[in-house]
């Protein structure tokens, strides 16, 4: 599960990528630090013209039962479950991050990040709603070192995988 992640919008890599897409942080999107469910996240997605664009997405979607907030979806089943299938096929997104947190058995928060500290993307899906566009982060079975702490981890993508994740459903299935 991924319930909190870290992003530094002052990072030169973040600024370079997002500036090239004409993005300027606004008051509506949380600026930096730890991001938690219900916050607006700066995200990459395809616009209606099929171009990569920056979009503010609210993290979390009401559960089908109407009770609770879904913040993650299992990558193994997201393209087969009716509740998620259309979102996976048509509305994938990328959420920039510098790290994510998991909690160990003693409820101690542990930060996982790249060894070089570079930015990466969390793979997600989003849904257009009347009020806000909402997103979920996709997870998979954890691999070391995360598996020592938790059984799930977010889908993590390198910058070079971004375009394929957003534009190619078959490639996205492979990454998931």
Segments the model singles out, each with a brief description of its role:
Residues 1-176:
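Short linear sequence motif anchored by a di-proline
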